[in-house]
Amino acid sequence: MEKKVIKKKRKKQEKRKKFRKFWKLGIEEFNTQYFSISRDHELVVREGNYQYNIFDLVQKFGSPLEVAFPFIVEKRYLDLVQTFNYHIKDYGYKGRFFYHYPMKVNQNKEVVLPLISEGANLETGSYNELWLVRKLWEQDQFDSRIRVICNGPKTDRYLGLVQELKEKGLSIIPIIEDLNEYEALKKYRGDVGVRVKLDLRVKSRWDKKNDRYGLSADDIYELGRIKNLKLLHYHIGSQTMHKDDIVAAVKKAIGIYIKIKKSNPSLDTLDIGGGLAIPYEKKKHYNPSSVVKSIISVLKKTCDKEGISHPNIICEWGRYMVAPAQITIFKILCEKPIDHGIAKNWYIIDGSFMNDLIDTWAIHQKWHIVPVNNLRNEKLTRVWLAGSSCDSDDRYTAGGSYILLPRLEDLDSSEYQYIALFDSGAYQDSLASHHCLLSSPAKIIAQNGVLTVARRRESPEEVGKMFGW
């Protein structure tokens, strides 16, 4: 009898494992290591010994719903710092590593404060973002050692705030991005950085033939000595798909760095910008540790050969840091047949791709989509998803492929199917809109076993007020 019970238990475990594998859950390489399937066939998220049942959350808070997990951000930050420091020590590299979180990726409090609390530095791209830094600084929410880099067009207000914070004791470095900014910062008494255009084509979401950011290497050489130059910065793109492109950029940048340092001995830091990709589609991808290892190796070998001291390293990998720390939940309202197409039906969701996940429309972003309930249903159907706005572009077709989801005909009459879209923590919140006056999703934060409402569901009156009604 006992053997039968054990055998039955093993069968259940094997079946659960099979479905986890099918939905690509519990896999660190895909950033789904915290996600699993409950005994009731529902999506769960595990934070140590805490567990969040996503189906229960959507029953309690309704849909559409965003669920943010600050603990994932904290863990990713600590892992990245540990990875850099490990390879720095392993190679005998003499420079230090600093992570600067680019606030534009996600300015929400539940993201920024956990990163700061773990020791992350910041990068701002506008006066308003730096104003928020000032507010936190005045509230004594910063360690005095925090460092801030300022990118973006430097308006007079922006530069004035940089000067004010520098005088108050904040370690702050404005980045020169054009010759006008070079002139404007001549009287600035603090450290400065300069952004270089690498003139390097890579496969990424942001690889443009004409780059409007930064100065050419020749322009920087012609400037000669730049007062208090501390940092050389570049940015090759977003979602850089090949490791070799990241390494090629480092090789080119360190060559430029060495030339500039000859006339600027104060230069001691290389900021490699952002661009580290994440596996949105949950396919095999380069390993971040191998990227870091190659970066350290290239910098050390090149500097040792040229007799130059190893520069400190800054990276601004924002999407990599925060995208996996949020999921977006929708309810399937109904289905409609597709007459001609690889998918069989449209599933109509109770939210909007154009409003809530705008990269679906803007850059044809692909998402990993998993059922919230009925995760062990073996009968699945090929579908496309349509948003609730009246716009024909409000849809998701997986790049011309299809999404596999449970069949609605198999549900109980009173049951709804819910779906989770992974990796929605980068850019989507700040770019969101209210097309067709649709309300934004409600948002909750799950941390340390506690649920906090970060944004309650908007009423029609509240949405109308945004448009003057």
Predicted regions and their residues:
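Alpha-helix-loop-beta-strand connector modules within alpha/beta enzyme cores
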Residues: 253, 291-303
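Short, glycine-/Ser/Thr-/acidic-enriched flexible segments
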Residues: 72, 106, 129, 155, ...
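Charged (often Lys/Glu-rich) extended helix/loop segments that serve as interaction or gating elements
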Residues: 304, 308-469
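Short glycine/threonine-rich loop-to-helix capping motif typified by GTGT followed
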Residues: 242-248, 279-291, 322-334, 400, ...
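Flexible glycine/acidic-rich beta-alpha junction loops that bind and position SAM and/or redox cofactors
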Residues: 202, 268-283, 314-326, 356
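Active-site-proximal beta-alpha core segment in soluble small-molecule metabolic enzymes
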Residues: 92-269, 276-278, 298
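N-terminal capping/small domains of soluble enzymes
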Residues: 2-156, 400-422, 426-429, 434-436, ...
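Glycine-rich, proline-tolerant flexible connector loops at the mouths of alpha/beta enzymes
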Residues: 67-70, 237, 241, 280-283
